[in-house]
């Protein structure tokens, strides 16, 4: 993980930090920066100093993000070799082997419904906790954090939530665009449903993983299956048309999502499909009866702030129990290190889960 700090203790990597926040350190290196205006708008990249209303650690994260050099341009969709290099560069900062050596959680690889899954089990779980299952869907723009990276993120998630975690290593572009990843997530959910029952299941996803998690709810409903006990969406992508206000207004203020027009891996994932299709942009779906109680997380510097608040409003309009946590000055996917803000998000999320998972 590229943090600019030496001698970082292994446990500081995971303490009080959301999975998407950790991943954002790597993810932000894979999003291009530009000094040009957004297409069809007058927006230009801006930079304001971090506010005094957040912790020093969070301020430092924003300052470092503002100073990072622009990475190489995003490859064209047909440039398979270019995408492989892009993914390798984006994955490199995550300290996978260091995370996997941290004791306290056993991780094993399984095949479920034809998909690869990493089962992470904290040591010393009670029998009641062993009866619960957390289906975790990683982010990374539909292209990053597969393989051992997904395994490491599974371990972190299990440690944070103190539960059995099933992390889907879903297929990704360039070889496997939509709907391959969503189909993998659905296959794993269906398999877990037989073993645990819906009342004992939690589904979560961050960023692109939040997109897949939300789309999964629609697919579960459409298949006539029972929805999980609860859903957590961390800075989710819900509208692939990039129509939200914050996508333009926060251009230059979010150190993670710096791609000026937002195509890149989105275009690769779409593979020519209509971005307004609900399985691609869940915001445009019929949300009624599809979603369990849902907890959404975003920040005031997250370029997907609009995606998150619009999804929250749409869920409320569909009479779904939905809660929204907005963190001051937080960019996409969190502050990426051990900050009071990251700890507050995790604490609030765990508190929200009480009484909702397992469902009474």
Predicted stretch roles:
Residues 296-298:
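Short beta-strand/loop motif that positions the catalytic acidic residue
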Residues 33-125:
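A glycine/proline-hinged amphipathic helix-loop "lid/cap" segment
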Residues 146-147, 154, 166-200, 339-341:
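Catalytic nucleophile-loop/oxyanion-hole region of alpha/beta-hydrolase
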Residues 2-20:
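N-terminal secretory signal peptides and thylakoid transit peptides that target proteins
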Residues 340-360:
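Catalytic active-site module of serine/aspartate enzymes centered on a nucleophile-bearing elbow/loop
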């Amino acid at each position: 993980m590229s943090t600019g700090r030496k001698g970082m203790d292994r446990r500081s990597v995971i303490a009080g930090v959301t999975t998407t926040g950790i991943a954002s350190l790597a993810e932000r290196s894979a999003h291009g920066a530009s000094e040009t205006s957004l297409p069809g708008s007058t927006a230009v990249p801006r930079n304001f100093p971090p506010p005094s209303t957040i912790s020093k650690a969070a301020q430092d994260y924003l300052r470092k993000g503002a100073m990072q050099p622009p990475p190489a341009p995003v490859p064209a969709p047909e440039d398979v070799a270019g995408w492989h290099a892009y993914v390798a560069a984006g994955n490199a900062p995550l300290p996978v082997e260091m995370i996997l050596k941290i004791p306290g959680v056993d991780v094993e690889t399984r095949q479920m419904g034809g998909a690869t899954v990493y089962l992470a089990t904290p040591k010393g779980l009670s029998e009641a906790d062993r009866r619960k299952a957390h289906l975790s869907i990683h982010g990374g723009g539909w292209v990053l954090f597969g393989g051992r990276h997904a395994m490491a993120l599974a371990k972190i998630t299990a440690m944070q939530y103190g539960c059995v975690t099933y992390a889907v290593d879903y297929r990704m572009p360039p070889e496997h665009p939509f709907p391959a990843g969503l189909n993998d997530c659905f296959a794993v959910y269906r398999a877990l449903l037989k073993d645990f029952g819906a009342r004992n299941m939690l589904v979560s996803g961050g960023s692109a993983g939040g997109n897949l998690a939300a789309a999964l709810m629609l697919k579960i409903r459409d298949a006539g299956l029972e929805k999980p006990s609860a859903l957590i969406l961390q800075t989710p992508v819900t509208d692939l048309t990039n129509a939200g206000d914050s996508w333009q207004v926060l251009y230059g203020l979010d150190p993670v999502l710096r791609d000026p027009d937002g195509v890149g891996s989105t275009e690769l994932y779409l593979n020519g499909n209509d971005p307004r299709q609900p399985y691609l942009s869940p915001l445009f779906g019929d949300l009624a009866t599809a979603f369990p109680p849902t907890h959404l997380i975003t920040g005031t510097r997250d370029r997907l702030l609009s995606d998150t608040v619009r999804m929250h409003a749409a869920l409320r309009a569909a009479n779904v129990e939905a809660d929204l946590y907005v963190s001051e000055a937080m960019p996409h996917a969190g502050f990426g290190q051990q900050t009071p803000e990251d700890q507050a998000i995790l604490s609030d999320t765990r508190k929200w889960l009480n009484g909702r998972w397992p469902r009474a």
